Amino acid sequence: MLTRRIIPCLDVKAGRVVKGVKFLNHRDAGDPVALAAAYNAAGADELVFYDITASSDERAIMVEVVERTAAEVFIPLTVGGGLRSVEDMYRMLRAGADKVSLNTAAVYNPHLIAEGARRFGSQCIVLSVDAKRVNAPGEPPRWEVFTHTGANPRPTGLDAIEWIKRGIDLGAGEICINSMDADGARTGYDLELLQAITAISPVPVIASGGAGSPADMYRGIVEGGADAVLAASIFHFGDYSIADVKRYLAERGVPVRQTFGSEVGTSTGA
């Protein structure tokens, strides 16, 4: 088994990190640059920033956040939210991001994936998918892709598994799958969804949505087949540290990069 990655996710709104439950009822979690620096010191393997405002007037704030963060951290940084063109991707990569995450824009313009992969390489393109279970009880499992996830998520009619297959064919180098049913609920990842995706994906898969404990992350990797596990609230609000998770995984035979940094506490919300 290859080394598995632990990735804190920072949802950024108006220059602050927030976290909600199923995309609603956001709580302030702190300053993004301070949190990123703390996670870097604590041994996180990567960081993900999502600009959940993503309006044109907020975009300059996000570019500045990425620039300041890139000057402080020395682990890969992925940035997503509102990236609608190759130029948008270029601005974030130039600001210091290592990868860009495409979601809603890719659904409405799938060739944006191919254009980004052609310009920057597949290793820079993460296809992020928000999926909701839509099968009736007793039916085979089925998940639909939603866009504009927030206060007004929009169904697309796209089957999540088929959309991911197409995204990979177009050049996505990594998949981040977020269970809308589990997001922020801290009841564990949707293992059935993860299994369905990892069974067909030749590229790395990041599990997102639902992590409430190191045990959930272990199951996401061992049972779900994820290459990396992403979490937000359990880290932001001090329930567990990166070291707690890595220790739990290592004790159960999951290979992780050793952590030598400090713990992430609640003092990063300046």
Swiss-Prot record:
Read off the Pfam families from this record: His_biosynth (PF00977)
Q: Which residues span the membrane?
A: none
> SUPFAM superfamilies given for it?
Ribulose-phoshate binding barrel
Q: Please give the pathway this protein is involved in.
A: Amino-acid biosynthesis; L-histidine biosynthesis; L-histidine from 5-phospho-alpha-D-ribose 1-diphosphate: step 5/9
* Keyword presence, Nuclease: no
Where does the UniProt annotation locate this protein? Cytoplasm
> Listed GO cellular component terms?
cytoplasm
Stored Gene3D superfamilies: Aldolase class I (3.20.20.70)
Keyword tags: Amino-acid biosynthesis, Cytoplasm, Histidine biosynthesis, Lyase
Instruction: Locate the coiled-coil region(s) and give their ranges.
Output: none
User: What Gene Ontology molecular function terms does this protein carry?
Assistant: imidazoleglycerol-phosphate synthase activity; lyase activity
Which reaction(s) does its UniProt entry say it catalyses?
A: 5-[(5-phospho-1-deoxy-D-ribulos-1-ylimino)methylamino]-1-(5-phospho-beta-D-ribosyl)imidazole-4-carboxamide + L-glutamine = D-erythro-1-(imidazol-4-yl)glycerol 3-phosphate + 5-amino-1-(5-phospho-beta-D-ribosyl)imidazole-4-carboxamide + L-glutamate + H(+)
Q: What is its EC number?
A: 4.3.2.10
| Broadest EC class assigned to this enzyme | lyase
Q: What protein family is recorded?
A: Belongs to the HisA/HisF family.
**Subunit-structure text:** Heterodimer of HisH and HisF.
Q: What does this protein do?
A: IGPS catalyzes the conversion of PRFAR and glutamine to IGP, AICAR and glutamate. The HisF subunit catalyzes the cyclization activity that produces IGP and AICAR from PRFAR using the ammonia provided by the HisH subunit.
Q: What is this protein called?
A: Imidazole glycerol phosphate synthase subunit HisF
Q: Which organism is it from?
A: Chloroflexus aggregans (strain MD-66 / DSM 9485)
